[in-house]
């Protein structure tokens, strides 16, 4: 310490205990001050290792090339990739921007749902009833590159099944977006979305 005292830290030490469990829970963080994109890498790892499904809830969808490719590749190899988005946005600019990614994702087999009762603020990935992430990390540049974020990775715990059940309950209140829906969007929304995409890395 600054007073040059020697302190006994023993009372603050945690005793480690072995548990007989097949799974684990790992809290983690992501910061913009290093070169490691922890938040994005965890999401991409889940997409790349999924066998049956990856179900996602996110309030924003502003993707870089790596994440867009991972979503498309997972769907193209037969994984059920489903994304729940808000039906009513909090920020129209981000909402219109998100919709510019819909045609590419839908063409690759990604399923997109919009929560018709209102806004979705959850940031959730759940895959194959074995892995899940819940935290603060949105699917946008701000969360993935510019902000301090945190999340929890769950592997083979009972909570993973509960997260999937919540996803299914939420999806039951959603409208599944079709390519026809995308084509029939108002012209001004399409224009605003494409213009906003020019500054997507700032959002």
Spans of features found by a protein language model:
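Charged, low-complexity intrinsically disordered terminal segments
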Residues: 1-203
């Amino acid at each position: 310490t600054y007073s040059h005292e020697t302190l006994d830290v023993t009372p603050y030490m945690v005793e480690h205990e072995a548990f007989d469990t097949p799974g684990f829970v790992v809290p983690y963080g992501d910061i913009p001050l290093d070169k490691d994109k922890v938040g994005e890498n965890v999401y991409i790892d889940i997409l790349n290792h999924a066998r049956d499904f990856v179900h996602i809830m996110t309030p924003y969808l502003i993707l870089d090339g790596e994440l867009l490719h991972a979503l498309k590749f997972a769907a193209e190899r037969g994984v059920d990739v489903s994304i729940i988005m808000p039906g009513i946005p909090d920020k129209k600019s981000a909402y219109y921007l998100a919709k510019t990614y819909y045609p590419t994702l839908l063409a690759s087999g990604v399923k997109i749902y919009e929560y018709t009762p209102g806004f979705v603020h959850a940031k959730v990935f759940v895959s194959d009833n074995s892995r899940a992430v819940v935290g603060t990390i949105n699917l946008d540049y701000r969360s993935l590159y510019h902000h301090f974020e945190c999340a929890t990775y769950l592997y083979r715990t009972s909570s993973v099944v509960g997260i999937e059940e919540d996803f299914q309950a939420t999806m039951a209140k959603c409208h599944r977006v079709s390519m026809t829906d995308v084509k029939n969007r108002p012209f001004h929304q399409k224009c605003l979305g494409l213009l906003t995409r020019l500054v997507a890395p700032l959002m």
